[in-house]
């Protein structure tokens, strides 16, 4: 197998591929242009979106030429893949802003030049509908489209005609990139398989060219939960939506059984180093988790920020050191009262999802103020508890929050 494809396979990226042997031979002979797309439906990507772009970085290291397609036109429709209901329709202004933010985010992470980023509005915004139906729609079988899991799943919930068009548009994207950039490979998550092979078929029918599609597994944790979700919501790559400290802690708290898998997927460490550190046992495995958290934080947020939150994490668990990057909650006492029920503050700061959960944690001995266990549900936090205008709240073993006045 081609070296680049073999690396993706070893690291757990490869799920399905059209004509793998033919693609491998092609990549042995020449460096190819390949692409992955992302719709501008949000102002930030989350960790679940990152896998295709990490794979792109591996392929780029082997000399292949990446294109990141920003779906500013397809964002007006929304991909039904993995969705049980129609996406919210966004304004042109929202989509334009999202497209810029996502481009900047991915450029910072991948270090790709601006020339690697293309918007599909370049060809989709000025399509003539009648000509599109005649020249593109004629190559699609409705029966075959309905056989794909994306559409089969939505038939029970309702599928709008606008969403039904999405596969044609993504296929046309691939056709246009093949036409203007000689793009030979599209990559994406496995939920994109139907859209990708439809693009491969369209190109073959339109101009006889052989192109390829490759998908990656949709990452789930060993507990069966979807990768990229936390108690605080989606693990966004934007630090304004999900703090860098929480991002680091998300990976630092990886379950033992996921450490090796995530080291291969979310870092660029060499195979022998991953094999060594992922085989640590007992408490030593925590070192492997720290390495995982640091490496992926470095990729997404830069080495300087990764070092800051690593030190903050060490400080939180040691009780000393630079704690400035531990998340904080700004709080003001009422002008009439200089105390607050701790359970209320825990809910206000969102360190617990409900008062009942806060009470349960206190009863089980899992809540600490400045290192001292809270014994009562009726515990009051007063100004006397604050040292240099802050106290440290710890919930369980791993959740730390500075309460600042």
Curated annotation (Swiss-Prot):
<comment type="similarity">
    <text>Belongs to the class-I aminoacyl-tRNA synthetase family. TyrS type 1 subfamily.</text>
</comment>
<feature type="short sequence motif" description="'HIGH' region">
    <location>
        <begin position="40"/>
        <end position="49"/>
    </location>
</feature>
<dbReference type="GO" id="GO:0003723">
    <property type="term" value="F:RNA binding"/>
</dbReference>
<comment type="function">
    <text>Catalyzes the attachment of tyrosine to tRNA(Tyr) in a two-step reaction: tyrosine is first activated by ATP to form Tyr-AMP and then transferred to the acceptor end of tRNA(Tyr).</text>
</comment>
<dbReference type="GO" id="GO:0006437">
    <property type="term" value="P:tyrosyl-tRNA aminoacylation"/>
</dbReference>
<feature type="binding site">
    <location>
        <position position="35"/>
    </location>
    <ligand>
        <name>L-tyrosine</name>
    </ligand>
</feature>
<dbReference type="Pfam" id="PF00579">
    <property type="entry name" value="tRNA-synt_1b"/>
</dbReference>
<feature type="binding site">
    <location>
        <position position="170"/>
    </location>
    <ligand>
        <name>L-tyrosine</name>
    </ligand>
</feature>
<dbReference type="InterPro" id="IPR002307">
    <property type="entry name" value="Tyr-tRNA-ligase"/>
</dbReference>
<dbReference type="InterPro" id="IPR002942">
    <property type="entry name" value="S4_RNA-bd"/>
</dbReference>
<keyword id="KW-0067">ATP-binding</keyword>
<keyword id="KW-0648">Protein biosynthesis</keyword>
<dbReference type="GO" id="GO:0004831">
    <property type="term" value="F:tyrosine-tRNA ligase activity"/>
</dbReference>
<dbReference type="InterPro" id="IPR024088">
    <property type="entry name" value="Tyr-tRNA-ligase_bac-type"/>
</dbReference>
<dbReference type="GO" id="GO:0005524">
    <property type="term" value="F:ATP binding"/>
</dbReference>
<feature type="binding site">
    <location>
        <position position="229"/>
    </location>
    <ligand>
        <name>ATP</name>
    </ligand>
</feature>
<feature type="domain" description="S4 RNA-binding">
    <location>
        <begin position="340"/>
        <end position="405"/>
    </location>
</feature>
<dbReference type="GO" id="GO:0005829">
    <property type="term" value="C:cytosol"/>
</dbReference>
<keyword id="KW-0030">Aminoacyl-tRNA synthetase</keyword>
<keyword id="KW-0963">Cytoplasm</keyword>
<feature type="short sequence motif" description="'KMSKS' region">
    <location>
        <begin position="226"/>
        <end position="230"/>
    </location>
</feature>
<dbReference type="InterPro" id="IPR036986">
    <property type="entry name" value="S4_RNA-bd_sf"/>
</dbReference>
<keyword id="KW-0694">RNA-binding</keyword>
<keyword id="KW-0547">Nucleotide-binding</keyword>
<feature type="binding site">
    <location>
        <position position="166"/>
    </location>
    <ligand>
        <name>L-tyrosine</name>
    </ligand>
</feature>
<dbReference type="InterPro" id="IPR054608">
    <property type="entry name" value="SYY-like_C"/>
</dbReference>
<dbReference type="InterPro" id="IPR002305">
    <property type="entry name" value="aa-tRNA-synth_Ic"/>
</dbReference>
<dbReference type="InterPro" id="IPR024107">
    <property type="entry name" value="Tyr-tRNA-ligase_bac_1"/>
</dbReference>
<keyword id="KW-0436">Ligase</keyword>
<comment type="subunit">
    <text>Homodimer.</text>
</comment>
<protein>
    <recommendedName>
        <fullName>Tyrosine--tRNA ligase</fullName>
        <ecNumber>6.1.1.1</ecNumber>
    </recommendedName>
</protein>
<dbReference type="Pfam" id="PF22421">
    <property type="entry name" value="SYY_C-terminal"/>
</dbReference>
<dbReference type="InterPro" id="IPR014729">
    <property type="entry name" value="Rossmann-like_a/b/a_fold"/>
</dbReference>
